[in-house]
Amino acid sequence: MKSSIIRFSVSLPQNLLETLDERLTHKGYSSRSEIVRDMIREKLNEEIWSSGAENTQGVAVLTIIYDHHQRELNQRMIDIQHTSTHKGNVEILCNTHVHLDQHNCLETIILRGNGVHIEDLSIEIGGLKGVKFSKLTRASRFE
């Protein structure tokens, strides 16, 4: 069901409006309404994820770069993902692996499930020896 659009006004200091308009132009938005809607969605999404509520459901992308020569690292990452999936806490939707160079690989893991468990999985994988970069992007929220 499509929700209706409601108009309302917002009062801003001139310098803040100018900054908003610069960002609107730079990012290619067609209107102030579009950029404000995106900013509101982003902020609400951040607040929901950061609430840590046990019933929070979400979708996220975990991006990691790691040294593929690190002993048993691949197996530990796979074990963590399988354990989380078998417990029913997190669903692994997709896993993409890219060889960056002789030593480093990049993986993206698309996750869906309980927000707290997604965060836990991210921290567990990110903390493994040999993981050089780890970032969880909270891609969307749904009820």
UniProtKB/Swiss-Prot annotation:
Alphabetical list of Gene3D superfamilies matching this protein: ACT-like. Chain A, domain 2, Met repressor-like
Organism superkingdom: Bacteria
Gene Ontology MF terms in the entry: DNA binding; DNA-binding transcription factor activity; nickel cation binding
UniProt-listed GO biological process terms: response to nickel cation
Cofactor: Ni(2+)
Residues reported to bind Ni(2+): 82, 97, 99, 105
UniProt keyword annotation of Repressor present: no
Keyword entries, A-Z: DNA-binding, Metal-binding, Nickel, Transcription, Transcription regulation
Keyword Cell membrane among record annotations: no
Cofactor binding note from Swiss-Prot or TrEMBL: Binds 1 nickel ion per subunit.
Family (UniProt): Belongs to the transcriptional regulatory CopG/NikR family.
Function: Transcriptional regulator.
Name recorded for this polypeptide: Putative nickel-responsive regulator
Organism of this sequence: Helicobacter hepaticus (strain ATCC 51449 / 3B1)
Taxonomic path: Bacteria, Pseudomonadati, Campylobacterota, Epsilonproteobacteria, Campylobacterales
